Amino acid sequence: MANILKTIIENDKGEIRRLEKMADKVFKYEDQMAALTDDQLKAKTVEFKERYQNGESLDSLLYEAFAVVREGAKRVLGLFPYKVQVMGGIVLHHGDVPEMRTGEGKTLTATMPVYLNALSGKGVHVVTVNEYLSERDATEMGELYSWLGLSVGINLATKSPMEKKEAYECDITYSTNSEIGFDYLRDNMVVRAENMVQRPLNYALVDEVDSILIDEARTPLIVSGANAVETSQLYHMADHYVKSLNKDDYIIDVQSKTIGLSDSGIDRAESYFKLENLYDIENVALTHFIDNALRANYIMLLDIDYVVSEEQEILIVDQFTGRTMEGRRYSDGLHQAIEAKEGVPIQDETKTSASITYQNLFRMYKKLSGMTGTGKTEEEEFREIYNIRVIPIPTNRPVQRIDHSDLLYASIESKFKAVVEDVKARYQKGQPVLVGTVAVETSDYISKKLVAAGVPHEVLNAKNHYREAQIIMNAGQRGAVTIATNMAGRGTDIKLGEGVRELGGLCVIGTERHESRRIDNQLRGRSGRQGDPGESQFYLSLEDDLMKRFGSERLKGIFERLNMSEEAIESRMLTRQVEAAQKRVEGNNYDTRKQVLQYDDVMREQREIIYTQRYDVITADRDLAPEIQAMIKRTIGRVVDGHARAKQDEKLEAILNFAKYNLLPEDSITMEDLSGLSDKAIKEELFQRALKVYDSQVSKLRDEEAVKEFQKVLILRVVDNKWTDHIDALDQLRNAVGLRGYAQNNPVVEYQAEGFRMFNDMIGSIEFDVTRLMMKAQIHEQERPQAERHISTTATRNIAAHQASMPEDLDLSQIGRNELCPCGSGKKFKNCHGKRQ
C-alpha cells in the first residue's frame, strides 16, 4: 500500500514539473504579446483560426494562444493569470481535471483552454451547476472573449428553441448540465431537423466537475409524457393503511435505507384491503403502492429529503448542495406517495419518453474536462468511468488555514450546545463564522438556538437560495455569522473584510461529517483562500448518521464509563477513524455508481442506435422508399419464417391472414395464390404485390415533398412510440433481474442478454408497424397547404388507434408458443394472443 501511495505521489510530482515547463513556454511570449496594440492582439484570433484550418493542431497553437488570453485578460479584466493558473489551463485542454483550491481563480483559469478550443469553430460548452453562475461567468468572462473576437451564448431553460439554437451556434456556450441534457433529449424527439438546437457535442469544460460527474452521476434526466391512468385514490388508500401501522408491522434496514412489511404488517394489509393473499400475482400493482407509501412515510424525511413549497408542491432537496431541485420528481410513483403523505394535490404519474444519465451524456463529448477544488478523493472513479486524470495544482500562496481535530460528543444535544457556545464566543470577538449543516432541519434548529443566545446571523438553505450569492459574499465580514446547508453558495468566493485577518480569518464549523470526505473538504475550503488565515472545526456526536452506521456503540460505552455526557473527546485517531468510515461509504457509493453504469450502458448502446437512425431520417432530403421497402421485405420474411415449422395448411392460413390484415387489400390474395410455393417464393410473391400497393399509396400524395414528409412522420412516430414503451420495459426488466441475483445469476449479464433480445424484438415491431401503416393508412389527395398537417395527423392517428386484430374463426391450438402471432402484432404468440389462452 505504501509503495502504491509513493508511486502516485511521484507521478503527481513528475506531472507538475512537466506542466511548469509548458507554462514557462507560455511566459516566453509575454513580452511579445505586451508589445502588440489592441487591434494586433485581437487579430491573433483570426490568424489562429486560419492556421487551424490549414492543418495546424490546437496543441501547437497552445503556447501563443494562452499568451494572447493572458495579455487580453490583463487589458480587459485587469487580471493577469498566475503560473499555476496557466498550468491548470493546460490540464483542462488535455481533457483532465486540475484540482485547484478555493480562491485560486478557476474561472480565470478556464479562459485559456476555452479560447484555444473555441478556435476550432466546433463549439465549447462551459457547464455550471446553476443558471446564476452561467450568467455571472458568461457576463464577466464574455467581455474578454468578445474583445478577442469570439461569440458567447448563454443557454437558459426559459429561452425559446430559436434562442437556444443561437446560443449553441456561438463559439462558446454557457449552460447548466441539466439544460444541455434536456436539449439533447428533446433534439432526439423532434420531427424536423430545423427544430434541433444543438450541434454535435465537441468539448465540455465542467465547473464543479465532482458535483456533476460524481454526486449526480446516477441522476437520470427524464423527458416524460403524462399517463392518463387515474391512481390518486390508490395512493391515498395505501397512505392511510401505512399510517395505521405500528412499529412491529414493518422492518427498516438503516444502512441500506430499505423497508418492508413484517408478518403482522402483511396480516393487517390483507385485512385492510380485504385480500386472501397480499402477494398473489393479481395484487402486484397494490404492493407497489404499499411499498411506496412505506418509503414515503418512514424513509423519506420532510426538510431533509424534500420540502413542501408555499404552492403546496413537493420539492426534492439535493443532498449534496442543500438546494431544492426545481422540476425534479422522484420516479416510479414515490413522488405521488410523498404527496399523499403530506396531504398536497397528487400530480399525474408520467411515462418516460426519453432519458439519459449525466455519466452517459458527458461521455458523448469528443473531449471532456472539468475543475474542482476537491477531486483527488474520487480519482479512481474519474479515471475508470470518464478516462480523466485528476492532477493537483499547487496553490499560488501557501495555505494558512488551521484544521483542528474533530470534537466528539455523546449526544446531539451536547454537540449543538458546544457549537452555539463556540459561535457566540467568536462572534463576540468579531471573527466571521460559517456553520455548515447537512440538512435544512439542522440549519433551522441551530438558527433558533443562536436567536436564543442573542447572536444575529443569516441562514442559507434550500428555502431561500435566491439570496445565496449575496449572503455568501458578506460571510467574510467582521462579526458575520452564516449558517449554510452543505455547499450552498459554491462557486462564490468568501472574501475577508477589513480587520478580519488579525482575528484569525474565517472560521468554518462543520456540525457533522458528511458520508463523503470530499464534501467535508469543500466546506473546509471556504476558509483560507489565496493564503488568507482561517480555521476549521468539525463537531460530531455518537447520534450522527455516519457514526450510527459505523461503530458508535463501542465509543458510547467509553463515554458512559467516563461519565462524559457534556464533554468532548478530541484526538487525531478519532479523525482517522471517521475518515476510514467515510472511505467505506465512498467505496460502496462508487461500486453502486459503477453497477448503475453497467446497466445504463445497455440503454446507451441502444439509444445511440435509435438516435443515429432517427437523425438519418430527419436530415434525409430524399425519398425514403428504399428504407421502407426494406422494412416491408424483412417483415414478410419474419412472418413466413415464424411459421416455417407449422403444417402446410396452417402455415398458409396464418400467412394469408397476415397479408390480408396488414399488407394487401383483403380480397386481393387467396390460398390458391400461395399453395405450391416454397417459403422463398412466398416471400417474393408477397413482396412484389406489396410493392404495387406501396406505389399505389404514395401516388395518392400530391407531390414529392408530400411523399417525403409522409415517410418521415410515419417512421418517426412509430419509432418514438415503440422506443418509449421499450424504455419502460427496460426499467421493469432492471427491477426484475435484481431478484434473479438471489438465484446465483449475475443480474447485469441477465439484463444485457434480455435487453438485447427485447431490443431486437422492438426493431421487428417497429418494422411491422411501419409496414402495416404504410400499406393500410387511409391516404387522401390533399391541396398542398393542408397536406403536411393531414400527413402528420393521419400517421399519428393510425399509430395510436390501430389495434392488432385476430380472425374469429382461426384455430389457435396448433400455434407454437414461440411462433409469431397470426394477428400481425409482430410479437411471439406466447406474448400476444397466446397469453390470453
From Swiss-Prot:
Is ATP-binding among this UniProt entry's keywords?
A: yes
Task: Report the membrane topology from the UniProt record.
Answer: Peripheral membrane protein
Superkingdom of the source? Bacteria
As cofactor, the record names: Zn(2+)
Q: Which UniProt keywords apply?
A: ATP-binding, Cell membrane, Cytoplasm, Membrane, Metal-binding, Nucleotide-binding, Protein transport, Translocase, Translocation, Transport, Zinc
Q: Which residues bind Zn(2+)?
A: 821, 823, 832-833
**One Pfam family for this entry, by name?**
SecA_DEAD
Regarding protein family, the annotation reads: Belongs to the SecA family.
Spell out the protein name for this chain.
Answer: Protein translocase subunit SecA
Q: Which gene encodes it?
A: secA
